[in-house]
Curated annotation (Swiss-Prot):
Keyword Flavoprotein: no
Residues modified to Phosphoserine: S11, S23
Keyword Ubl conjugation: yes
Protein name: Uncharacterized protein YMR295C
Cross-link (Glycyl lysine isopeptide (Lys-Gly) (interchain with G-Cter in ubiquitin)): K26, K32
One GO biological process term: regulation of cell wall (1->3)-beta-D-glucan biosynthetic process
Region (Disordered): 1-31, 157-197
PANTHER family per the UniProt record, alphabetical: MEIOTICALLY UP-REGULATED GENE 9 PROTEIN
Further information: Present with 10800 molecules/cell in log phase SD medium.
Record-stated family: To yeast YGR273c.
């Protein structure tokens, strides 16, 4: 096995020369300012996450930028609630003021899907602006010719009844009347035998 040795004269001179070179380098103030470590120059994922917009802020920017996706507050200067079509809501629903009172329940779900995805297919499937609460034209009426007024309410035929949708059956339980036969029956004990007095 071989051993390698350093020459002492070369190693001493190289160490001595390196120390002299480090002391000879001068850094100017401009270089110090340019090379100073700053947090803005460091790629820090936590700082990037803090400085980026929140999801609701991004959604608000999307609604303002994309006219296909109207928000409920698209008329911000008037502060009027609007439906997904941008139409002002004149009669709001009691439980959800961001939908019209006569909006179809399935349309509420479809409008949420449209607001989230922005897909115009959902907007095309909405029926409320066309029909309101009217029955669809292709709905089978099974021989009963029901006509509807401009508000989508069924019109009265004959005017005899004051109720709009006809008489609804109300459940009434049977009246239990005790007859004399039931009162005369004597109580029997175990195995059908008469009780002793």
């Amino acid at each position: 096995m071989m051993h390698f040795r350093k020459k002492s004269s070369i190693s001493n001179t190289s160490d001595h020369d390196g120390a002299n070179r480090a002391s000879d380098v001068k850094i100017s103030e401009d270089d110090k300012a340019r090379l100073k470590m700053r947090t803005a120059s460091v790629a820090d994922p936590i700082l990037d996450a803090v400085q980026e917009a929140q999801p609701f802020e991004q959604a608000a920017d999307t609604f303002h930028d994309n006219m296909n996706r109207q928000s409920y507050f698209s008329n911000e200067e008037g502060h009027v609630l609007c439906d997904v079509f941008g139409q002002p809501i004149t009669q709001a629903d009691i439980s959800n003021p961001t939908r019209a009172r006569d909006e179809r329940p399935l349309d509420t779900i479809r409008s949420f899907e449209y607001a989230v995805s922005g897909d115009p297919v959902w907007a095309q499937q909405l029926e409320t602006p066309t029909y309101g609460f009217r029955v669809r034209p292709d709905f089978p009426v099974f021989g009963a010719a029901v006509t509807y007024d401009a508000n989508g309410m069924p019109q009265q035929v004959g005017g005899a009844s004051s109720q709009m949708y006809g008489e609804q059956a109300v459940y009434q339980p049977q009246q239990h009347v005790q007859t004399e036969e039931k009162q005369k029956k004597k109580k029997k004990g175990l195995f059908g035998r008469m009780k002793k007095k």
